[in-house]
Amino acid sequence: MSKDKDIKVTPGTCELIEQILALLSRYLSSYIHVLNKFISHLRRVATLRFERTTLIKFVKKLRFYNDCVLSYNASEFINEGKNELDPEADSFDKVILPIASMFVKCVETFDLLNYYLTQSLQKEILSKTLNEDLTLTAESILAIDDTYNHFVKFSQWMIESLRIGSNLLDLEVVQFAIKCADEDGTNIGETDNIFLQEILPVNSEEEFQTLSAAWHSILDGKLSALDEEFDVVATKWHDKFGKLKN
C-alpha cells in the first residue's frame, strides 16, 4: 500500500469525510424508506410471503450499515494525532481506510439487492400476482442502476486516488469489467464503461477536497433522481394496491 504523507487528518478533511458519509447514509436511507413501504404492501399478498421475508432481511442489513455510518466520528482521529513520535498518527489513510471498506461493503450489498429487486423479484411478482401493481417502473430501475454505478465508481476513485488499494478492497463489478476488457482487447482509453475510466492519484489535501466536492455534487444529483423515482413508484403502489386496505 502506497501512502501519501502530504495528506493529513485535519478539521477540513474530517468535515469532508462527514459529507461523504452523509451521502452514503442518504443512499442507505432511500432504500430503507422505499423498501419498508414495499414490505408493508407485500404483507397482504400471501403468495409473496417468502419474498417479503427476504426484503426484511435486506432492510435489517441496510439499517445496520446506516447505524454504523451515523455513529462514525472522523474527528476523533485528530486528537489521536498529537503524538509526534507516532508516524501514523496523522495519516489520512488511518481515517479513510475504514470508510473505503464500508463503501465496498455497502455497494456489494446493493449489487445483490438490486439484482434481486429489479430482476428476479419482478418476475416473481408478475407470475404470482398476474399484474404489475407491485412492480417497479422502467425509469426507477434505470435510476437504481445509474446511482449504483456512480457509487461504485466513487468507491473505486476514493481507493485508487489515494493509492490505498488492496485485493480486500476490490469490487467484483469492477474486476469483472477489467477481465472482460482484457479478454476482448478493449482499448480502455476509448471505452465509455464507467468502471474502466482511468483514475489518477491525488497528491494533496486540496486536490482531494476539490475532486471530492465534484463527486459530492454528482452523487447528490443521482440520489435526488433516485428519490424522485422511488416516490413515483411508492405512489403507484399506493394508488393501485395500497388503497385496498381501506
UniProtKB/Swiss-Prot annotation:
Gene Ontology molecular-function annotations: RNA binding
SUPFAM superfamilies: RNA-binding protein She2p
Positions occupied by motif Nuclear localization signal: 15-23
One BP annotation, GO: mRNA transport
Gene3D superfamilies xref list: She2 domain
Transmembrane segments: none
Location(s), subcellular: Cytoplasm; Nucleus
UniProt-listed InterPro entries: RNA-bd_She2 (IPR024261), She2_dom_sf (IPR036827)
Keyword tags: Cytoplasm, mRNA transport, Nucleus, RNA-binding, Transport
Highest rank taxon of the organism: Eukaryota
Keyword Magnesium among record annotations: no
Annotated GO CC locations: cytoplasm; nucleus
Purpose of the protein: RNA-binding protein that binds specific mRNAs including the ASH1 mRNA, coding for a repressor of the HO endonuclease. Part of the mRNA localization machinery that restricts accumulation of certain proteins to the bud and in the daughter cell. Recruits the MYO4-SHE3 complex to the ASH1 mRNA. Also recruits LOC1 and PUF6 to ASH1 mRNA, which are required for translational repression of this mRNA.
Protein family per UniProt: Belongs to the SHE2 family.
Quaternary organization: Homodimer and homotetramer. Interacts with LOC1, MYO4, PUF6, SHE3 and with RNA pol II subunits RPO21, SPT4 and SPT5.
Name under which the protein is recorded: SWI5-dependent HO expression protein 2
Biological source species: Saccharomyces cerevisiae (strain YJM789) (Baker's yeast)
